[in-house]
Amino acid sequence: MRQSNWDCDLRGAGGESCQKSDGRQVLSNNTDYPTCLKRDINRQTDGTLVLETDLTVKSGSGFYIGFWGKETEAVKLVFENGFFKAAGKTLFAFPYGTHRFQFIADIDKGVAKLHIDGVWKAEIPFTGNADCIDSFRTGFAKDAVGEALLGLNFKLSKNYLVFDLCVSAVESALPAEYELYTETGKAKAVYRRYTPKTLYHVYDLTAQKETDAGVVRHFDRASGNVSFEIKYLPPEKNAAVKISLLAANRTVITLTDDGEYVNVGEQKLYHHCKNVWQTLNIEADTASQTALISLNGKKITTLAFENLTEFVDAFSIALHAQKKASVLFADMVVFVKPPYPADYVPEPLVPEKKGDYYVGINVCPIWHGGHHYGWDEITPFQENRPYLGFYDEGIPEVADWEIKWMCEHGIDFELYCWYAGQADAPMVRSSWSSAIHNGHMKARYSDKVKIALLWEASASAHPQSLDDFKKYFVPYFLEYFFKDSRYMTIDGYAIMSIYSPWTLIQNFGSAEKVREALEYLRSEVRGLGYKDLVIMCCSENVPNTKLCGVDAVHAYNWGRKGYDPDATKEYVREDVKAGYVHCVPTVSMGYNVVAWNMGRFPCMKPDDMQMLLEWCRDEILPLYKDEQESWKRKLVMLSTWNEYGEGTYLMPAGIHGFGYLDAVRSVFCKDVPHVDTAPNREQLKRLDVMHPMDRKIVLPLEQIPLPETGKVYRKFTFQTKEDFDKWEFHGFSKVEIKDGKLVGHSDKPDPYMVLKEAYLPIDAAKVSLIRVHIRANKAGHRGCCIQAYYSVTPDKKLYDSSLYELTDPNHVTALDLKVGNNKQAPWKDQVTAFRFDPIWGEGDFELVDIEFVAAPAHKTLFIDGKTIILAQYMQELDGKTYLPFDTRSDLVHIPNLYYEWHETERSLHLFGVKNAVLTENSDTAVVDGRSVPLERPMTLYDGMPLIETEFFADILGFSYRKDQTGVYMTSKNIQ
């Protein structure tokens, strides 16, 4: 998948991918085409933008970097032979190698500033005529050759007084904007890697014995409500940290930290855990001359200014060392908080519940600009588009809309997926945490919906020992979750969950050790005043849940059958019946993973969700009557709030609007008329900050199935010994022909069967899908998955070829395994090896047959002799052949092709040896600026523009021919 908002013209790089392990490569190795990496942003007409990254120029000349607006240059720098220039004027030396690079564009003044390796280098007027900025661009012009690299961390911010998130990976002395004060030689401050195993970088202030030292950072004078935030790791002993907000070198607010308490003067404000990075936030209001103090997301107190002032203009962090000591600090942010606009999120109207019920919802916090591959991939699918638009969840106003919608529909808490940033040291920051720490905890209505912890124990850093868990994870959980008054409780029990606790068995050595770890966590939570801690996990109700010391199971989602109320009832009943631990009934809307390119599947109807929730309330919850564990009869979980890629989301969106939330409200809240409100376009502009509202890409929508002939190209039955002998079997404890079926059992984790070489190859072009008639049941599980593997190469290396399918454990059913555009091995040419997995792991199966379903007659596309597999077959229309422009296929890897889709115009822009614009429903194209008539208007088929193949070849400069079975395009390099 592509990373959101980036459009990469790689023709100058011969089509080589720009995504590298150490950053984004900007490469030009020919002078036939340009190279350009473009990152769109919402159009900015005022204010100051700051771009920060590590920039490496490796070779050549002609590399450029800058900002554009409306396709017009605003300001651009060009690298030539070791120097950066602007408008032909040499600015400063920039030796080949890696440098900290900060590019500041002041739109109001039309001025840019450059800050390189911590030193101010230049201030220049804008070099272009753009009256706004809506994209960042970097690359090489057509006639330039060279290589550069943008660092892994790449930040773009606007109108912050300070926005230092320690982006650079270049270790250095203190940058010029920071000042160290101390007795000569008694202290030093540097910027360095935090630990050898992490990519994080921090500032380190180290002072010798009996030394006072500090670092101060000045910024433009600011009045109003000025927010200052800093993360710091205090020394455990023999030193005290002092953090101050300043005005003209006078202290406005000062707090100290002795490694155990945060203090103001002699007054102890807050006791914190050791081995935890503290997040201190000071909101200094120059109107009231007071400051709101928050620590780790929690409001602690309000203090009067120490000295009256109309502004603040600096902060400092200082160290009083009795013995040699260090304080680490990072992520300093200063900005003026604007007042709430008149059209801010309306205050929630919380309905009265029908009973003593609590409803939680799983939350996936990946929707923060630049932290995922998400929004672009979501844009083609209108049913997945949330009513909040393509929002940034680190914005408190976004959180307030979410909170409003949840609490107005009976949802009590958000169970946030939490990903550890590292596991072998105190965490500077956790991964994908902007939603909770910058959004929810800073939201105006944050107390209306509680928070809870869903620890993702597998897909993030996880503790390698029980000691690491106790030392680094538990203190973090306490400080950033359980100490917060907004944390979710039921009758005094705190609620949390773990995703994949089985990972901890591997880390700690046994289920018993996991139990010991969780009991330690419980004891620490009880020490905060909770009655106890309920620990759920996302799992089926199996023996290991009890052995690990988990209290309950719930579903993160129910997979593809989550849309089916009867399937959900069966799953819940099975977990209740298993009885190893408690089952929290969970309701999902389905699992339509089309946006993540894993298939289109049904979604639940709101009426079915209402019925299913009523069943949970009326039939499942009453099963639990123990007064000592009252939470069991009160708690229902929903899956999930915002998994738009996985296709399981209750957030109001295109598919059913508020339908799912209204179903929740109707079941758990008293029937009082209400009105659902959503942000208008002007309000959305404040939420959709990093993803332009109207940006959209084109992808196969998978709404139209591949056509079938109703015929079978090749069929393998299991009725005779001859049928049996066509296959080799691996990992089965028993397999035989019985009653016209292949019947087998496995007690191993990965059994499979391989088609013998004598029955290969298979012509891939003549097969549209693989249909299997099978029943399979994995012991202790709900059905089982089947999957096919194949090879299309002479080495016969097998690849996972198809999406898995879920079997019915009780009946033989027909399941279709879709084959096609696998990235590693597309379904093409000759299938040289084939493997089928009739069951995943231990269990039994009955396999009736495997059918290779015949594809209809169609032409195959060949480019430079390579077969191009498309999501849909090419179409014959009026004697012409049209290809669907499938942007998930190898079409987009043609070395001399670049494309853009412009949603507002509904037009496809193609760049090859010629440039062309095709607009939906128009029978005229624009080629190199001239109007060219088309045989028929350009239309979209299953979301993909249809392009006449000879026209396409002409744009690329390829030779062209076709026959009854194929279309052949050849580049000049091959010719």
Model regions and ranges:
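Primary recognition of N-terminal secretory signal peptides and signal-anchoring hydrophobic helices
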Residues: 855-975
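Short tryptophan-centered beta-strand motifs in secreted/extracellular beta-sheet-rich domains
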Residues: 53, 97-107, 112-114, 276-285, ...
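Glycan-processing catalytic domains of CAZymes
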Residues: 338-706
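Secretory/extracellular carbohydrate-interaction modules
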Residues: 22-84, 199-261
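Extracellular glycan-recognition surfaces and repeat-rich motifs
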Residues: 2-26, 172-202, 723-740
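Flexible glycan-contacting loops in extracellular carbohydrate-active proteins
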Residues: 124-155, 303-328
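Extracellular carbohydrate recognition
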Residues: 143-162, 320-331, 828, 839-852
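Extracellular ligand-binding interfaces
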Residues: 59-88, 116, 236-268, 276, ...
